């Protein structure tokens, strides 16, 4: 069967500007349409069930960011000053290469490559690759930061949604996009992005660490599209190619053709789960940066579809009937958390993933109250306790669900007090064009939960003892798709109505 646990997310960020740099040929290696440079994600989409996609149109100019994913916007505008005299000042700088053209330190992300003059303000330059040991040591810090960022996002999403409505989002998807934006972010934008993402200042090696989070169950691919008149810096192109396995592709002057090109990429990289992301493309669109994460996970132990039946679920002040998956001896790690007054349960999935469910302890407790009490420290304590808990045969009742969410991310960014994302974004490391602005940012998620699993249930009959543990999900709940290896949420959300 097709779907077991299916999640799809899309994030769309469109950047538009008045015009490109006055000299579009300055420091731009992306003017050649690399149609032959196919993104590596195309063959991976069909292997997973959870899919996430991010669309961005930022103009980032990479200048001196090492492999760190921390970039914030600074008020430093690097105008087209490198276009007037691209290579006439190499001898005035006592660099180690007296007469070598400094305009092509591309394809290898050199460590000590001289950056273009930036009039005193910080602007990211060539990226320094970290060793495997450094990247590995960064992963624990990144996982912890992703937990903090996920809880920030959860509360921001919850505040923007109507009361008692379903929602689902991928913090990993959004973080992946914003981290790639960091490659080209200047001063204040860099600082603010680091703060929003809960990254330490100058978080080196974050891009490689993030790449390491893509495991067999989670596939991440990226692609950049840009208008012909937009000069993208070589440093950003090379960093994106090395760290995100994508090379920019040039859009045409035909909006319909561009729309088809982008939607086709989306469909391929979400296994056709999202066949049409965009219905139209703004005429002033300059850059589209896409990141698709497709995650496949099946139940470690299969639910028997024959045991799925219509059962009561408490929704608002009424009781509705929904398809409930049932098992008398399903392996569940669970306990009662007194801080949240909630039942916490963890179900194993394939590829070292798990589904964590937090449901109010009884009908007297509301999901809203549980959400308000859910802080990063409380969440981390719960996950640590789950890690020490054993999976035991449990009488499990869990609704079959499908949740689709679409959210304007600009309002979320404002909720997170990151106002410069809309008004004063500094992407000097991506392009010299100072006029680029974010015109749209969308995040879409689809969650589908059905019975199919990886391993067949054991055929041996086991008598059910009277003391059998019970975990019933018959009222609104919060869910987390958890990466057990790297310890971070891939997806989060809540379910009020399993039918929606």
From Swiss-Prot:
Changing residue 493 to R: In HAE1; phenotype consistent with hereditary angioedema type 2. GO terms for biological process: blood circulation; blood coagulation; complement activation, classical pathway; fibrinolysis; innate immune response; negative regulation of complement activation, lectin pathway. One of its GO terms (molecular function) is serine-type endopeptidase inhibitor activity. Keywords: Blood coagulation, Disease variant, Disulfide bond, Fibrinolysis, Glycoprotein, Hemostasis, Protease inhibitor, Repeat, Secreted, Serine protease inhibitor, Signal. Residues 85-119 are annotated as: 7 X 4 AA tandem repeats of [QE]-P-T-[TQ]. The record marks 466-467 as: Cleavage. Highly glycosylated (49%) with N- and O-glycosylation. O-glycosylated with core 1 or possibly core 8 glycans. N-glycan heterogeneity at Asn-25: Hex5HexNAc4 (minor), dHex1Hex5HexNAc4 (minor), Hex6HexNAc5 (major) and dHex1Hex6HexNAc5 (minor). SMART domains: SERPIN. The record marks 465-466 as: Reactive bond for chymotrypsin. Changing residue 130 to Y: In HAE1; phenotype consistent with hereditary angioedema type 1. Changing residue 408 to V: In HAE1; phenotype consistent with hereditary angioedema type 1. It is found in: Secreted. PROSITE patterns: SERPIN. Glycans are attached at residues 25, 47-48, 64, 69, 71, 81, 83, 88, 92, 96, 238, 253, 272, 352. Serine protease inhibitor, which acrs as a regulator of the classical complement pathway. Forms a proteolytically inactive stoichiometric complex with the C1r or C1s proteases. May also regulate blood coagulation, fibrinolysis and the generation of kinins. Very efficient inhibitor of FXIIa. Inhibits chymotrypsin and kallikrein. Belongs to the serpin family. This is Plasma protease C1 inhibitor. It comes from Homo sapiens (Human).
């Amino acid at each position: 069967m097709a779907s077991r646990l299916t999640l799809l997310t899309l994030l769309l960020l469109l950047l538009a500007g008045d015009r490109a740099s006055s000299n579009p040929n300055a420091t731009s290696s992306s003017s050649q349409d690399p149609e032959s440079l196919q993104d590596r994600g195309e063959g991976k989409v069909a292997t997973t069930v959870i899919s996430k996609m991010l669309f961005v149109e930022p103009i980032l100019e990479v200048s001196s960011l090492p492999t760190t994913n921390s970039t914030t916007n600074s008020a430093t505008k690097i105008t087209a000053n490198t276009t007037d005299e691209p290579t006439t000042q190499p001898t005035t700088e006592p660099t180690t290469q007296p007469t070598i053209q400094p305009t092509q330190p591309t394809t290898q992300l050199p460590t000590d490559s001289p950056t273009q003059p930036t009039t005193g303000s910080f602007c990211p330059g060539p990226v320094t690759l970290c060793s495997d040991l450094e990247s590995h040591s960064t992963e624990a810090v990144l996982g912890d930061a992703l937990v903090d960022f996920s809880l920030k996002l959860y509360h921001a999403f919850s505040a923007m949604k109507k009361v008692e409505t379903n929602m689902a989002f991928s913090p990993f998807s959004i973080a992946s996009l914003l981290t790639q934006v960091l490659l080209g972010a200047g001063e204040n934008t860099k600082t603010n992005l680091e703060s929003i993402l809960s990254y330490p200042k100058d978080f080196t090696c974050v891009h490689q660490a993030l790449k390491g989070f893509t495991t067999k169950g989670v596939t991440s691919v990226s692609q950049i599209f840009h208008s012909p008149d937009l000069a993208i810096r070589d440093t950003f192109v090379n960093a994106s190619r090395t760290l995100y396995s994508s090379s920019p592709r040039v859009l045409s002057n035909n909006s319909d053709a561009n729309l088809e090109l982008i939607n086709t990429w989306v469909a391929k990289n979400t296994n056709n789960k999202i066949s049409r992301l965009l219905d139209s493309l703004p005429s002033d669109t300059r850059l589209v940066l896409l990141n698709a994460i497709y995650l496949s996970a099946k139940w470690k132990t299969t639910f028997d579809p024959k045991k799925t039946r219509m059962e009561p679920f408490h929704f608002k002040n009424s009781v509705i009937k929904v398809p409930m998956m049932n098992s008398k001896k399903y392996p569940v790690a669970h306990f009662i958390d007194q801080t949240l007054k909630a039942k916490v349960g963890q179900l194993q999935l394939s590829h070292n993933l798990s589904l964590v469910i937090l449901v109010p302890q009884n009908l007297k407790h509301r999901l809203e109250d549980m959400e308000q009490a859910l802080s990063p420290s409380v969440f981390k304590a719960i996950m640590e306790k789950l890690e020490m808990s054993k999976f035991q045969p449990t009488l499990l009742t869990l609704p079959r669900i499908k949740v689709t969410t679409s959210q304007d991310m600009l309002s979320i960014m404002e909720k997170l007090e990151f106002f410069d994302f809309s008004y004063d974004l500094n992407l000097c490391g991506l392009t010299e064009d100072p006029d680029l602005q974010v015109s749209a940012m969308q995040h879409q998620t689809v969650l589908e939960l059905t019975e199919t699993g990886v391993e067949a249930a054991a055929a041996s009959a086991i008598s059910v003892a009277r003391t059998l543990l019970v975990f019933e999900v018959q009222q609104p709940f919060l869910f987390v798709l958890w990466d057990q290896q790297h310890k971070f949420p891939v997806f989060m959300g809540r379910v009020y109505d399993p039918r929606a």
